[in-house]
Amino acid sequence: MSAKEIRFSNDARDRLLRGVELLNNAVKVTLGPKGRNVVIDKAYGAPRITKDGVSVAKEIELADKFENMGAQMVREVASKTNDLAGDGTTTATVLAASIFREGAKLVAAGMNPMDLRRGIDLGVTAVVKEIKARAMKVKSSSEIAQVGTIAANGDAAIGEMIAKAMDKVGNEGVITVEEARTAETELDVVEGMQFDRGYLSPYFVTNAEKMRVELEDPYILVHEKKLGSLQAMLPILEAVVQTGKPLLLISEDVEGEALATLVVNKLRGGLKVAAVKAPGFGDRRKAMLEDIAVLTSGQMISEDLGIKLDNVTLDMLGHAKRVLIDKESTTIIDGSGEKAAIQARIQQIKAQIEETTSDYDKEKLQERLAKLAGGVAVIRVGGATETEVKEKKDRIDDALNATRAAVEEGIVPGGGVALLRAKSALTGLTGENADVTAGISIVLRALEAPIRQIADNAGFEGSIVVGKLAGSNNHNQGFDAQTETYVDMIEAGIVDPAKVVRTALQDAGSIAALLITAEVMIADIPARDSAPAAGNGGMGDMGY
């Protein structure tokens, strides 16, 4: 075990504070509409240019181990805020640095760190309650666009694109962001359920020009196992032929003789048919097949359920208005499933999302939910260079997360105004002793930090801006750094999601309060470079 270096009390907190300030100084320049970009060197490829606070924070690693501990703790604030709210990472960093800076001063002056921490917790709880009380529900598509525009650094085109996407697929729908192959940024909406499995044979194609299968009003057979022979299916195939409708066959795989028989029937015109592999793997495949069955009002043919292929009747098959299949994907449009059954399935998936602790499982469940609930929208991000595309993609990700948070918990005035006005919740609030009350006053001062930083980044004196707003009776009055004027933030469309503001303060207060209570720091002593090897062993005395 290597030797350790130990630091105590004020010396320890000073080193922590130095690390916190270094990280904060790198991140805070990105705050607000006139915030600057940060250029990050990469081990390979072009440098990355970003205005995303958490991306900057994640790149910072300091040489001094004690300073690095402080930086890493605040980096944790940015990451946690990003995970919970998806935006507000720079605000969280600025708040954490302000709370820790003031707290460290008071501890150095002889106040009790544990009482200060209690005061900070009291202050944060009161402010969060105030923010929740003042939040306004998002009512229209234009309000969603406003939230997206602010989070995308004032890019109205991005805000409108996200609002359009949410309008098409609903609040539960999946909106994904991908890199485009062109210079244009565009929105592509897939209605109905789409999964990433294409036709098993190009002979199934009905539209040769677009190389895709188009089935109108088809029956859908959902089968769990592989199909090697069609012997057991003959009764149901004959029943489908009698109706004159097409058939889509979804199963684990269709092999050899079975596939050849289907292709021959299709080419001879006896049966309009197409076959695709089932999406997913293992248990997830079974769940997705059940989703398709619910969506199309059919039954999954599974021996686990006691249903065999030779017993299948027409009423066990699913049904949809239209099915489109290309080489890589299958889209089922307007399935005839009952609304109540689909809604029950949606609630079941939502319950699973609440229970799961795995991010990967959560993401896959969200995808299933979206496919049942509304559809999928894809924003394809274009740009002149790869660096520009990546920077734009960061902003769209932030905007997307912000709009989802706004729909969830409502909106508050943006530009740091919500936190500044929430100071009223702390007026007259005192603790059980002077040190706890001092902890509350730390939060009171920190609430001004974001708006001061936004003003500083716009070239204004933060103190003057805060002073001017303090004299206004309009709770929505704020400083628009873009136009450099004082406006009603709600009327001007400068809004923040309440969830983002609340999460930023809670995470910042939690980590900063912990840092204040740190009394001892322990780190490995850096290993000295070993001395160079002294010549060839055993050859030293040979007189050469």
Curated annotation (Swiss-Prot):
Family named by the database record: Belongs to the chaperonin (HSP60) family.
The name this protein goes by in its record: Chaperonin GroEL 3
EC number, as in UniProt: 5.6.1.7
This protein's UniProt keywords: ATP-binding, Chaperone, Cytoplasm, Isomerase, Nucleotide-binding
Location relative to the cell: Cytoplasm
GO molecular function: ATP binding; ATP-dependent protein folding chaperone; isomerase activity; unfolded protein binding
Source species, domain of life: Bacteria
One Gene Ontology biological process: protein refolding
UniProt keyword Nucleotide-binding present: yes
Gene: groEL3
Keyword ATP-binding: yes
Catalytic activity line of the entry: ATP + H2O + a folded polypeptide = ADP + phosphate + an unfolded polypeptide
PANTHER family named among the record's database cross-references: 60 KDA HEAT SHOCK PROTEIN, MITOCHONDRIAL
GO cellular component: a single term: cytoplasm
Quaternary structure and interacting proteins, as annotated: Forms a cylinder of 14 subunits composed of two heptameric rings stacked back-to-back. Interacts with the co-chaperonin GroES.
Positions bound to ATP: T30, L31, G32, P33, K51, D87, G88, T89, T90, T91, G415, D496
Pfam family, one: Cpn60_TCP1
Root EC class: isomerase
Function: Together with its co-chaperonin GroES, plays an essential role in assisting protein folding. The GroEL-GroES system forms a nano-cage that allows encapsulation of the non-native substrate proteins and provides a physical environment optimized to promote and accelerate protein folding.
